[in-house]
């Protein structure tokens, strides 16, 4: 066996699943952790925590595979993506579909350990993961669908932990959508010139010269929604200090994107990992101080 060939193939699969770029998994993980702690207002059961953490990473990997499969004929025309495994030929289309099926199967097996209500909701998660990659062909709002896909773990968490879908669940879901649209618009600003050339749609194109303003308004909406959740659930001062810190990070992101320079927009996007982590720390410390 040619071990170098085997290693190259394994590395290509890892790149297809974005194992080398964990930012997407982290941006999916933080809202899931927010929900896990808020749904029961306590440290979640280890089994439930494990299922959702593993589910985040397997479903994010599945989402990356189906996204690259959907974009396989587009990515070759974009500087940032032309070296990806599918457009470069390192991975075949059949292999990608089999890998997607395997990742979804593992994710569903994890969900089967939860209650029937959560299992039913998981079908929506699969539908969103499948539909999102194709939205950029038909609408300028694919980021909105991504927000729903990235946030669907929230109602699943609430049903798994409390078997209910209270108002706080849907407020958290909305907060995640506004946050996701904001940071994915920053991400789309990196590729805006290429997207305009090849006809791919995004909120960065839709918002045009108002992109920075709308991102700021979405970030403000995120903070307001999270503030309402804190008030409704009686979270303490530490939580609001975390929100103030998140507001400071959002202001820093606005400074980064002021000239719409590609690398700076990408740095602003990456900075959202700190936002998610800070909010989680605020929730955790607030609950521990009860």
From Swiss-Prot:
<dbReference type="GO" id="GO:0006744">
    <property type="term" value="P:ubiquinone biosynthetic process"/>
</dbReference>
<keyword id="KW-1133">Transmembrane helix</keyword>
<keyword id="KW-0831">Ubiquinone biosynthesis</keyword>
<feature type="transmembrane region" description="Helical">
    <location>
        <begin position="268"/>
        <end position="288"/>
    </location>
</feature>
<dbReference type="InterPro" id="IPR006370">
    <property type="entry name" value="HB_polyprenyltransferase-like"/>
</dbReference>
<dbReference type="GO" id="GO:0005886">
    <property type="term" value="C:plasma membrane"/>
</dbReference>
<comment type="pathway">
    <text>Cofactor biosynthesis; ubiquinone biosynthesis.</text>
</comment>
<feature type="transmembrane region" description="Helical">
    <location>
        <begin position="213"/>
        <end position="233"/>
    </location>
</feature>
<feature type="transmembrane region" description="Helical">
    <location>
        <begin position="141"/>
        <end position="161"/>
    </location>
</feature>
<comment type="similarity">
    <text>Belongs to the UbiA prenyltransferase family.</text>
</comment>
<dbReference type="InterPro" id="IPR030470">
    <property type="entry name" value="UbiA_prenylTrfase_CS"/>
</dbReference>
<dbReference type="InterPro" id="IPR000537">
    <property type="entry name" value="UbiA_prenyltransferase"/>
</dbReference>
<keyword id="KW-0997">Cell inner membrane</keyword>
<dbReference type="InterPro" id="IPR044878">
    <property type="entry name" value="UbiA_sf"/>
</dbReference>
<keyword id="KW-0812">Transmembrane</keyword>
<dbReference type="GO" id="GO:0008412">
    <property type="term" value="F:4-hydroxybenzoate polyprenyltransferase activity"/>
</dbReference>
<keyword id="KW-0460">Magnesium</keyword>
<keyword id="KW-1003">Cell membrane</keyword>
<feature type="transmembrane region" description="Helical">
    <location>
        <begin position="238"/>
        <end position="258"/>
    </location>
</feature>
<comment type="function">
    <text>Catalyzes the prenylation of para-hydroxybenzoate (PHB) with an all-trans polyprenyl group. Mediates the second step in the final reaction sequence of ubiquinone-8 (UQ-8) biosynthesis, which is the condensation of the polyisoprenoid side chain with PHB, generating the first membrane-bound Q intermediate 3-octaprenyl-4-hydroxybenzoate.</text>
</comment>
<feature type="transmembrane region" description="Helical">
    <location>
        <begin position="99"/>
        <end position="119"/>
    </location>
</feature>
<protein>
    <recommendedName>
        <fullName>4-hydroxybenzoate octaprenyltransferase</fullName>
        <ecNumber>2.5.1.39</ecNumber>
    </recommendedName>
</protein>
<feature type="transmembrane region" description="Helical">
    <location>
        <begin position="38"/>
        <end position="58"/>
    </location>
</feature>
<dbReference type="Pfam" id="PF01040">
    <property type="entry name" value="UbiA"/>
</dbReference>
<keyword id="KW-0472">Membrane</keyword>
<dbReference type="InterPro" id="IPR039653">
    <property type="entry name" value="Prenyltransferase"/>
</dbReference>
<keyword id="KW-0808">Transferase</keyword>
């Amino acid at each position: 066996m040619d071990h170098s060939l085997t290693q190259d193939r394994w590395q290509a699969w890892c790149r297809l699943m974005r194992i080398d770029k964990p930012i997407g998994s982290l941006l999916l993980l933080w809202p899931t952790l927010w929900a896990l702690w808020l749904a029961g207002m306590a440290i979640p059961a280890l089994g439930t925590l494990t299922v959702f953490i593993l589910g985040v990473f397997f479903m994010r990997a599945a989402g990356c595979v189906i996204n690259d499969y959907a974009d396989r004929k587009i990515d070759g025309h974009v500087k940032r993506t032309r070296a990806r495994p599918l457009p470069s030929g390192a991975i075949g289309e059949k292999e990608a579909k089999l890998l997607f099926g395997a990742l979804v199967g593992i994710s569903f097996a994890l969900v089967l350990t939860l209650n029937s209500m959560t299992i039913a909701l998981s079908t929506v998660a699969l539908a969103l993961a499948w539909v999102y990659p194709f939205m950029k062909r038909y609408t300028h709002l694919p980021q909105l669908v991504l927000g729903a896909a990235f946030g669907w773990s929230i109602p699943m968490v609430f049903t798994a932990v409390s078997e209910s879908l209270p108002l706080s669940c849907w407020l958290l879901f909305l907060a995640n959508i506004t946050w996701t649209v904001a940071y994915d618009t920053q991400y789309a600003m990196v590729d805006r010139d290429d997207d305009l050339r090849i006809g791919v749609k995004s909120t960065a194109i839709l918002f045009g010269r108002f992109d920075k303003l709308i991102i700021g308004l979405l970030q403000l909406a995120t903070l307001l929604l999270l503030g309402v959740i804190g008030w409704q659930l009686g979270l303490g001062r530490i939580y609001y200090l975390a929100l103030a810190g998140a507001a400071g990070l959002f202001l820093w992101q606005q400074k980064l994107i002021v000239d719409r320079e590609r690398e700076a927009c990408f740095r602003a996007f990456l900075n959202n990992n700190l936002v998610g982590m800070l909010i989680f720390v605020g929730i955790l410390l607030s609950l521990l101080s009860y």
